[in-house]
């Protein structure tokens, strides 16, 4: 039988689970002489994961540009992760037909100027992006 404080704590976690999201600033890295630009939509909690769409733009090689979905399993609430930091490992699913999903590692570094590091590991290389994030309140339907 659950104690009252445990029920209140669990209820508080559930009510705050989807109350916040990560907003990541657009960023870029270099691969040889090519600039690779990354844009990520709000990383929002859905079904135990942080989920966002992404867009990679490679101006010197448009065929290398890509869009897709990022899925990062998460065990904390967004506000807890934003305060404590941590590393999440998940998958980036490309919208390109027949593309293999790529591993993505997301390091949240609140004690380093709200820094975030995103590494996308492909068959050919690892793209390493450095950016900053803000924890924002999400709109509710109530």
Where are these regions (language model features)?
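Sec-dependent, cleavable N-terminal signal peptides
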Residues: 1-5
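Central antiparallel beta-sheet cores of small beta-barrel/beta-sandwich binding domains
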Residues: 7-142
């Amino acid at each position: 039988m659950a104690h009252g404080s445990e029920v209140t704590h669990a209820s508080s976690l559930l009510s705050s689970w989807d109350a916040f999201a990560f907003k990541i600033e657009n960023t870029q890295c270099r691969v040889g002489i090519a600039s690779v630009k990354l844009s990520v939509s709000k990383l929002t909690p859905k079904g135990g994961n942080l989920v966002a769409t992404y867009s990679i733009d490679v101006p010197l090689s448009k065929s290398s540009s890509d869009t897709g979905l990022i899925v990062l399993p998460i065990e904390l609430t967004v506000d807890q992760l934003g305060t404590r930091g941590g590393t999440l490992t998940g998958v980036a699913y490309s919208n390109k037909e027949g593309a293999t999903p790529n591993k993505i590692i997301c390091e949240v570094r609140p004690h380093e100027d709200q820094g975030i590091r995103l590494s996308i590991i492909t068959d050919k290389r690892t793209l390493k992006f450095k950016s900053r994030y803000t924890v924002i309140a999400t709109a509710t339907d109530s």
